[in-house]
Regions:
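Short beta-strand/loop motif that positions the catalytic acidic residue
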Residues: 191, 197-199
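Conserved alpha/beta-hydrolase "acid-adjacent" motif
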Residues: 204-209
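Hydrophobic, aromatic-rich cap/lid helix
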Residues: 159-186, 202
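Flexible "cap/lid" loop of the alpha/beta hydrolase fold
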Residues: 101-109, 114-152
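Catalytic histidine-centered segment of alpha/beta-hydrolase-like enzymes
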Residues: 228-237, 241
Length: 249
């Protein structure tokens, strides 16, 4: 089975594409699975690359063992997985939402492991989100709808070792993202990896915050996808291929 026991958590990972190709670590969004985030882009992304899809603690096939969860722990888990599966690195890292926060932390805590960063639907501070995201109203169009939420729950119940624990896990995950202190301007300026930011124009992330991130990351590009909500960013496969493919190459 494709698990690595890291700090008491069996971390699921799976590989796609060319085993001899340049390695890319793919980090999914919160509550969802690797395929739930990267399924629409995997065909072209794995063409000529070694794609390593990771499922973080409590997500997909990886159990929630009760270990305290944080973005920093997730990043350290990924760093150890890179050492075991790839070697010392560096690797390209593409993270979406929770995965992008994890990728940012990875680049800060383990800079030698990261060659290039793709950060989709990400912020660097809690105030980078529109305020209704962390204090949501039921009818806000930026938020996941009932159909999307039901699909996430169905995936959880299909793959999770703790398949009946979706709602308790949801409660455990809330503070991991919403209570994140974020990073200072100087910390972000210290990231040397070339970075591509991708957000939707109807994302959780405020566009002025995305522009601030563009200014802070030393070697950075920003793409804004039109008519795109947060949950739709990774579904824009053709647009992402045009944006991400050349950047990684």
């Amino acid at each position: 089975m494709p698990y690595e026991e890291i700090d008491g958590v069996p971390i699921w990972h799976e590989e796609h594409g060319d085993p001899a190709g340049p390695p890319l670590v793919a980090l999914h969004g919160g509550i969802v699975t690797f395929h739930g985030s990267f399924g629409d882009v995997l065909t072209w992304l794995s063409d000529g690359r070694r794609v390593i899809g990771v499922e973080l603690q409590g997500h997909g096939h990886t159990p929630d063992t009760g270990r305290p969860m944080s973005i920093e722990r997730f990043a350290d888990d990924v760093a150890e997985l890179i050492d075991r599966v790839v070697g010392s690195g560096p690797v390209d890292v593409w993270g979406f939402s929770l995965g992008a926060l994890t990728a940012t932390s990875l680049a800060l805590r383990h800079p030698a492991k990261v060659r290039r960063l793709v950060l989709a639907g990400s912020n660097i501070r809690p105030d980078g989100y529109h305020p209704e995201i962390t204090a949501p109203e039921q009818d806000d169009p930026r938020l996941p709808n009932e159909e999307e939420f039901a699909a996430w729950q169905a995936d959880y119940e299909a793959f999770a070792p703790n398949s009946a624990d979706f709602l308790p896990f949801l409660e455990r995950m809330q503070p991991v993202v919403h209570d994140l202190a974020g990073w200072t301007a100087d910390e972000i300026r210290s990231i040397s990896a070339p970075t591509l930011l991708v957000v939707g124009d109807r994302d959780f992330v405020r566009l002025d915050h995305a522009a601030e991130m563009l200014d802070l990351f030393p070697d950075c590009r920003l793409a804004v996808l039109p008519a795109t909500r947060h949950t739709e960013v990774m579904q824009r496969a053709d647009q992402l291929r045009v944006l991400v493919g050349p950047f990684l190459s």
